[in-house]
Every structure is written in structure tokens, then in C-alpha cells.
Design a protein with these regions (language model features):
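A gly/proline- and charged-residue-enriched helix-loop-helix capping module
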Residues: 111-130
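N-terminal secretory/targeting leader peptides
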Residues: 12, 24-110, 128-325
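Bacterial N-terminal signal peptides that target proteins for export
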Residues: 1-11
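Sec/Tat signal peptide C-region and signal peptidase I cleavage site
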Residues: 19-23
Length: 325
């Protein structure tokens, strides 16, 4: 190797070392286990997109399973307080902060297939709720269905008196309308609560069959009613975001937007497999007929107007926009 070639090789190595040493590593906190499908299907592509979009100047490190602090309910505050640079959570866990966002989860408001794109088409309507953080990703999920341990649910009468875990207040209103008792509980606690009989069932999408092993503790799965739909988000600490260059901020936001679509598509695909998996594990899948579903939907229908009236502001505009009215 000639002197000039050696010089180029050394110079290149020094530039690479300087770039790596100067990289900003951002922490992403998730309460879900490291075995969750979201790691390979969503987070790793997000990590790659951030690194690629910033030329390696910004990297993302995952902290799964509550490694930066236990409890899904505290996820939003971890981003606000800077414990994590990014945090994934559900707006329903801190519902008082996100009344407008949560209109998207009301029964029959979101189209399962187009919900995430519909949300982003009208994202300005939600922007005021994210003043304390930087919104990076927001997506709709698969419909929430009803897992039950012992009672096969085919009519609202079957729900009477049952203790049903719900992901949010709005989902709780639906359970109440059917005659059940809503129980607020993080997803990580459902398995033990159902196994021990603390709850009789749970409202959650069918990714939970495998992701949270509900196929092991529930015997019945009821679907076909107008369902609530739990939004997910990734939010970022404002100071961490502000500390990035304009170019790198744009790269993070672009990666987050891509992650929204990817997360939604992945959840829908895994949820579809979750129904089949439930049957394979010996569970009963109850697919309501049109007449059976109508009995549930008639009781749920007034919830939308009730919540819109309580929230006020532009809640009615959001519901109309998401419904395509």
C-alpha cells in the first residue's frame, strides 16, 4: 500500500470513529416484553430509519419490559420528564391528557383498514394535546374484542355482572352499556388477573392471544360488534427533540411517520393470526351474526354522542373527519 493510500485509510478510519463517538444515542422505553413482535417488526426498522436518515448522527437504543421503570401508565410521564427520550404507550392510560385523541377509539368511529392514515390526514386536530412532548408516531390498532375465561358471550345478557378489563374509560363505557363492570388494568396484568379470577374477561385486540398469552387463560373469544380501537403513540421528550439539528429532527419525524404505518399494518396482520391461534389452542371463537351484533351495537351507539358532548372543543369535527362525513 502506498503512502497516499495509507493516508486515506487512516483518515477514513478517523472520520468514522469521530462520527461514531459523536453520535447521539436516544433511549426508547417500552413496557412490553423484549419478545413482543413490535421489536423486530417496528422498532428495528425505526432504529434503522433514524440512523440512516441522520447519517449515523442519531441512534436509538431499546429498553424493553419496563427497564427504565415499571408500569405502562407511567410511560407518558417518562417522556415528559426525560427518563426516556422516546416512550411508547396508549393515550388511554393517561386519558385526561388526551380526550381528543381518544375520540378515535370510540365504537364505530375508526375504519380498521384506513384508521391510521385517516388520523394522520387530520393530525392538526389533535396537535394541542401534545404540547408537552413531541409526537413522533400515532396509529390505530386492531379492533378490541372480548376474551372471557368461563362465560361464552353471545348477547349483552351474557355480560351482565362480569368484571371486564378495559384499556380506557371509553371502552369502559361500552362494557357498562352492556351491563358489565369495567376494570381499569394495564395489559401486563391481564394474564394473572384472568387466571386467578380477579376478572372474568378482557377487552383487547387479538394480538394478545400470543403477545400476552391470553390464549392460555381464556376459553372464549367474542367478535363482530362495533368495537373500540386503542390508539398507540410514540412520544419524545421535548428537550431531546430540541437538541437535534433541523435535519435530524426531520429524519426522526419521517421515521416515526413510517413507523406509524408499519405498526398498524403489523398489528392487523398479527391480530388476524391471533384469532386462528386462539382456535388452534382449543378456544372457542364466537363470530356474532348480524342480528346478534346489532343487540350490542344498539347499546353502544349513544356512547359516541355522550363522549363528544363531554369533551367539547373540536371533538365533533374529529369524529366526522374520521368517519369520512
Amino acid at each position: 500500500m502506498g503512502l497516499f493510500s495509507k493516508f486515506n485509510a487512516v483518515a477514513g478510519a478517523l472520520v468514522l470513529a469521530a462520527t461514531t463517538a459523536g453520535a447521539t444515542e436516544l433511549k426508547l422505553a417500552d413496557f412490553q416484553p423484549p419478545t413482543h413482535f413490535v421489536v423486530d417488526k417496528v422498532y428495528k426498522p425505526f432504529q434503522d430509519a433514524v440512523s440512516s436518515g441522520t447519517g449515523g448522527a442519531v441512534t436509538v437504543r431499546l429498553y424493553m419490559g419496563g427497564e427504565l421503570g415499571p408500569g405502562p401508565v407511567e410511560q407518558y410521564n417518562r417522556a415528559v420528564d426525560g427518563v426516556a427520550d422516546f416512550a411508547i404507550s396508549l393515550p388511554g392510560y393517561t386519558a385526561s391528557n388526551f380526550p381528543l385523541t381518544l375520540t378515535a377509539e370510540l365504537p364505530g368511529v375508526i375504519n380498521t383498514e384506513t384508521g391510521t392514515e385517516d388520523i394522520w390526514s387530520h393530525i392538526d386536530l389533535f396537535a394541542d394535546e401534545y404540547r408537552r412532548v413531541q409526537l413522533v408516531s400515532l396509529w390505530s390498532s386492531a379492533p378490541n374484542v372480548l376474551y372471557t375465561r368461563d362465560v361464552a358471550v353471545r348477547s349483552p345478557a351474557d355480560v351482565q355482572g362480569l368484571n371486564i378489563r378495559v384499556p380506557s374509560r371509553n371502552a369502559g363505557l361500552q362494557v357498562e352499556a352492556w351491563g358489565g363492570n369495567p376494570v381499569s388494568m394495564p395489559v401486563t396484568e391481564i394474564y394473572n388477573a384472568m387466571q386467578t379470577g380477579v376478572i372474568d374477561g378482557a377487552m383487547i385486540d387479538t394480538t394478545a392471544t400470543r403477545a400476552f398469552r391470553l390464549g392460555e387463560v381464556a376459553k372464549h373469544l367474542t367478535l363482530g360488534f362495533d368495537a373500540t380501537n386503542s390508539p398507540f403513540f410514540i412520544v419524545m421528550n421535548r428537550d431531546a427533540f430540541g437538541g437535534l439539528s433541523d435535519k435530524n429532527q426531520a429524519a426522526v419525524l419521517e421515521a416515526g411517520r413510517e413507523a406509524s404505518t408499519l405498526a398498524n399494518q403489523t398489528q392487523l396482520r398479527v391480530a388476524e393470526g391471533g384469532v386462528a391461534a386462539f382456535e388452534e389452542m382449543g378456544g372457542e371463537v364466537i363470530r356474532l351474526t348480524g342480528e346478534e351484533a346489532a343487540a350490542f351495537n344498539a347499546l353502544s351507539a349513544p356512547i359516541v354522542d355522550k363522549v363528544v358532548a363531554e369533551v367539547g372543543g373540536n371533538a365533533a369535527d374529529i369524529v366526522k373527519a374520521l368517519r369520512g362525513e
